[in-house]
Amino acid sequence: MGRQWNVLFDVVTSTYASFPYSPYMDAYKPELGMAAGARTNNALKYTLATPDRKWVGTLQYSFGEKNNTSSVANMALPALGAATGGQLTGGSNLNQGIVAPVGPGGSLVQVNTVKGVIDGAVANAANDPNPNALKNAVEDVGMGAMKTFGGFLRYSANGLSLGAGAMRTTLPGGSDLDAYTLGGSYRTGPWYFNAGYGLNKYKAVGTGTTSGSYINYLVDRQILNKMWSGQTNGGFSGGYFENAATKRQMIKLGFGYQATKQLNLGAHFFRAKQSGSSDGTYNGNANFMVLAADYAFSKRTDAYAAIDYTKVSGGKGLNLDVASQARSRTGITIGLRHRF
């Protein structure tokens, strides 16, 4: 029991990994963005296998341990309440008007709504490239224990490996993320071929009618966005508000070739489709390509190099960088690794 790789990560890396000779070599791993965070806290795992290990199956369960959004609400609501002269509290109706003195006479005029104030604070925090209190509070909740249940089944024989996995994650605010993956690989001589499919379906808790319930919704949405938009996962956003995407699919194809005893080469292509955005802002596609080479100097020391390319298209909310709004990116990785 403890912080462990989840069953989705296990089945992908053990059955149809992008770079099987060293699945942790390259930091560019779009398929791991479909693995619900890849690691799970407070996890229990139970594995069964046939004596020849042709069949392997694992079940996983983790405890939520009262991880909830109250820390974010306790931090955000007093600050927003002070900024609005005490007009915003945890029980405030989302449509309630926020008034302020306007003009020479100081007449009170509605300048915003409770929902508008919260949305503005979230947007400012999300678009700020630097750490800030609101993002840090949400990230602390996201790093806490969440309730999960899932499993995987794998078959391997004569160079062929097939596997499938599924897992449900209940987020702190009450939303559910259902994640599925299936795929396979085949080895023959120096060649390795792999293909896989991943699906994430997000079932959001309702926005409710009060600021407190709306914060639950927004925190869950941000945690999902963190899983989806990390740079190692491809790095494109699913959105933050009611027009956010709720479904992401990905296919991958690739091959590896062991050119010599020391030199391994690989090329992989991934295509993702994002949908569910109510106004289309976050609906679209993403293509990922990566070429990599690894040279082993010894059993414990190797050098590697990779070049990757990412391009997104579709709704105006799809981009790879908040500041520049870039829709394409090229990355180069070079490294030397020694295992102690």
Please place each PLM-identified region on the residue numbering.
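Outer-membrane beta-barrel and related beta-rich outer-membrane complex signature
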Residues: 11-17, 69-73, 205-209, 279, ...
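Loop-centered beta-sheet repeat module
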Residues: 59-82, 86, 93-99, 128-176
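Outer-membrane beta-barrel "beta-signal"
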Residues: 295-297, 326-340
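Outer membrane beta-barrel
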Residues: 1-66, 154-158
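Extracytoplasmic loops and strand-loop junctions of Gram-negative outer membrane beta-barrel proteins
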Residues: 26-30, 132-137, 231-239, 274-276, ...
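Transmembrane beta-strands of outer-membrane beta-barrel proteins
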Residues: 2-4, 58-62, 163-167, 194-198, ...
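Structural signature of outer-membrane beta-barrel domains
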Residues: 6-10, 64-68, 158, 169-171, ...
